[in-house]
C-alpha cells in the first residue's frame, strides 16, 4: 500500500512540475523576444587576422502572433542590416522566418543551454548560436564589436580603390 502512495505522490509532483514549467514558459514570453547576439567565426583573412562577424537579432512579438526579426551585422566599422531580417511564426521550439528577400529560414531554441541556433554557419560549418543580451554580457559584446572595428581599420586590411592606368 505504501508503495502505491509513494508512486502516486511522485506522479503528482511530476505532473504539477510540468504544468508549472509550461505556465512559466508561456508567461515569460519564451525565447522569441528581446535582443540576442552571437559571433560568426569567418576564418582568417589574407593578412592573418582572425575574422569575426557580430550578429545581433531583435525579436518583437506582433499583435497578429507573428514575430518580427531585425538582424544587424557588424561589418568592419559599419553596422548594417543582415539578410535574415523578416517576419516569422512560432512552431514549437522553432521560429520559421520569411526573410525580406522571400527565403524561408529556421531558428531553433535549445532550452537546456538557453541559446538559439541560427541558419548562419561558422567557417567550420557549425551553426552560429546566439544568446540573450544582458547587462552581464553587454561588455563582452561591445569588446567583440571593438575588435572587429580595430581589425577593419588596420592599414594592411584597407581596400585599395585606386585605379591604375596603363599607357601603351
Mark where each language-model region is.
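N-terminal Sec-pathway targeting helices
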Residues: 1-15
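Small side chains
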Residues: 8, 17, 38, 82, ...
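Sec-dependent signal peptide cleavage junction
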Residues: 16-30
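Tryptophan-anchored aromatic micro-motifs
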Residues: 28-55
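Short beta-strand segments that buttress and anchor functional surface loops
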Residues: 37-41, 68-74, 95-100, 118-120
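N-terminal glycine/threonine-rich, aromatic-flanked beta-hairpin/loop signature
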Residues: 46-94
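Glycine-centered tight beta-turn/hairpin loop motif at sheet-sheet or coil-to-beta transitions
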Residues: 50-52, 77, 100-104, 121-125
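Edge beta-strand at a domain terminus
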Residues: 81-94, 106-168
Amino acid at each position: 500500500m505504501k508503495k502505491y502512495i509513494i508512486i502516486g505522490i511522485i506522479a503528482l509532483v511530476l505532473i504539477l512540475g510540468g504544468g508549472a514549467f509550461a505556465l512559466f514558459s508561456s508567461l515569460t514570453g519564451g525565447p522569441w523576444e528581446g535582443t540576442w547576439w552571437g559571433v560568426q567565426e569567418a576564418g582568417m583573412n589574407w593578412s592573418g587576422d582572425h575574422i569575426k562577424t557580430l550578429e545581433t537579432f531583435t525579436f518583437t512579438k506582433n499583435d497578429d502572433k507573428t514575430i518580427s526579426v531585425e538582424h544587424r551585422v557588424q561589418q568592419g566599422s559599419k553596422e548594417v542590416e543582415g539578410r535574415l531580417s523578416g517576419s516569422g511564426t512560432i512552431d514549437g521550439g522553432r521560429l520559421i522566418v520569411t526573410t525580406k528577400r522571400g527565403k524561408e529560414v529556421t531558428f531553433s531554441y535549445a532550452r537546456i543551454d538557453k541559446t538559439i541556433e541560427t541558419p548562419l554557419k561558422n567557417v567550420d560549418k557549425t551553426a552560429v548560436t546566439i544568446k540573450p543580451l544582458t547587462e552581464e554580457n553587454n561588455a563582452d559584446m561591445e569588446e567583440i564589436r571593438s575588435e572587429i572595428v580595430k581589425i577593419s581599420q588596420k592599414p594592411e586590411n584597407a581596400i585599395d580603390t585606386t585605379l591604375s592606368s596603363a599607357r601603351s
